[in-house]
Regions:
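Catalytic binding pocket for nucleotide-activated donors in carbohydrate/polymer assembly enzymes
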Residues: 12, 125-131, 151, 158-192
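Short, charged/polar "capping" segments at the starts of alpha-helices
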Residues: 2-4, 63-64, 118-125, 178-181
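A nucleotide-sugar donor-handling region in carbohydrate enzymes
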Residues: 1-80
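Short acidic alpha-helix that forms the nucleotide-activated donor recognition element
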Residues: 140-150, 165
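A conserved mid-protein helix/loop that constitutes part of the nucleotide-sugar donor-binding site
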Residues: 63-69, 86-97
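Catalytic donor nucleotide-activated moiety binding site of glycosyltransferases and closely related
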Residues: 55, 89-137
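A short acidic, glycine-rich active-site loop
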Residues: 78-90, 190-191
Length: 192
């Protein structure tokens, strides 16, 4: 922060508060910075004529073993076992929804943009093998996918700020409630 830098001797004129610079690329003045839907779809073997639905995931705890959750809980001094259970149940139910939806809607390409903390997941591989219109893609920035997508869904991600800055809206998919202490305040009062 500016105050911290100034407290360490930096001149105030050299510490302007500008906001989140990385969000500037989502401003209208930067239109053209990101690839358009057709270019992005072709790059990843998706049909650009279909609806491009983006799901921004953040099920980082779902891929952790109980032992890993216990170790993390011990290090942090907070019990994450309930939140890990919420992650697992939410992911399982969300993927079941996607399975049914994609079976009924072959006109949709669904890109599952996993969170960097999500590890290899057998359930994702199985759904991708079953549904040719389900794609687990981590390449490119979440901003790139947000800009190109026709529709967006989120479970619980700070990427909701990028969605807003891109001038888009999103659906919040929550098959089960998230514990209050883990739910980002930006979602308070949201309908889902």
């Amino acid at each position: 922060t500016a105050q911290r830098l100034q407290a360490h001797g930096m001149d105030a004129k050299n510490t302007p508060v500008t906001g989140a610079v990385m969000m500037d690329f989502l401003r209208p003045e930067f239109k053209g910075y990101f690839k358009d839907k057709e270019t992005l779809c072709k790059e990843f073997g998706l049909d650009p004529a279909k609806q491009l639905h983006l799901y921004i995931s953040s099920f980082g705890y779902a891929s952790m073993t109980d032992q890993e959750v216990a170790e993390l809980s011990k290090m942090a001094g907070t019990d994450f076992s309930g939140f890990a259970r919420t992650n697992r149940v939410s992911m399982e139910k969300t993927l079941a929804w996607f399975d049914r939806y994609l079976g009924d809607h072959p006109e949709v390409e669904l890109v599952y943009r996993r969170h960097p903390s999500e590890w290899k997941c057998k359930a994702l591989d199985e759904l991708a093998a079953k549904r040719p219109n389900f794609h687990v893609i981590f390449a490119d920035s979440v901003k790139q996918w947000i800009v190109a997508a026709d529709s967006i869904s989120i479970w619980m991600s700070t990427a909701v700020a990028e969605v807003y800055m891109a001038g888009k809206s999103c659906h919040i998919l929550r098959p089960v409630p998230i514990e209050h202490e883990y739910d980002p305040v930006i979602y308070a009062g949201a309908d889902y």
